[in-house]
Amino acid sequence: MSKRIAGPEIERLIQLLARVPGLGPRSARRAALHLIKKKEALLVPLGGAMQEAAEKVRICSCCGNVDTSDPCTICTDERRDPATLIVVEDVSDLWALERADTMNVRYHVLGGRLSPLDGIGPDDLNIKGLVERVASGAIKEVILAVNATVEGQTTAHYITDQLSNFDMRVTRLAHGVPVGGELDYLDEGTLAAALRARTTL
């Protein structure tokens, strides 16, 4: 058992920070120390912002985005093209595409990708909601912006099959997305090129 080096509140802060993706125990300790040193300028406001987010964050019942309102800001933005829908695996992919600032459209978040080995099937994803949105008749193009992994390809083919009876185009991202790559790690220029070069399936 390792020695404790600080009080339980600080230890808990370090443990929670270590659970954030990209932060291991060492990075969490450094982050905790930085926050503590900047208590008034950073720790207190961060604590308040996290408390407020915990109370107000919602999952959009329409698209699956994370926001403080339901429907979310993107779904209620009347300046966005309601006839084009970009399908992504996760909210982080949606945010990455928004950073590319190439298309002013709406989104649909699946909440993952098909992965039989991990026990993730169609019923575990928000595919039914996607089919219902397309069935409304307002959508003329669905852009599949899933990751270029084996699971992503499987998900894209399954969705294409599910949407095959509707009178609309199904396209997917093309050039710029490397095989095995994940959208959240791509730069804005690459994402913009991929959106412009999408192809019909």
Swiss-Prot record:
Protein's UniProt keywords contain Metal-binding: yes
Zinc finger regions, C4-type: 60-75
GO molecular function (one): DNA binding
GO terms (BP aspect): DNA recombination; DNA repair
Record's keyword annotation contains Ion transport: no
Stated name of the protein: Recombination protein RecR
InterPro entries referenced in this protein's UniProt entry, alphabetically: DNA_Rcmb_RecR, Rcmb_RecR, Rcmb_RecR_Znf, TOPRIM_dom, TOPRIM_RecR
PANTHER family cross-referenced by the UniProt entry: RECOMBINATION PROTEIN RECR (PTHR30446:SF0)
Family per record: Belongs to the RecR family.
The entry's keywords: DNA damage, DNA recombination, DNA repair, Metal-binding, Zinc, Zinc-finger
Span of domain Toprim: 83-178
Task performed by this protein: May play a role in DNA repair. It seems to be involved in an RecBC-independent recombinational process of DNA repair. It may act with RecF and RecO.
NCBIfam families: recR
Organism of origin: Brucella melitensis biotype 2 (strain ATCC 23457)
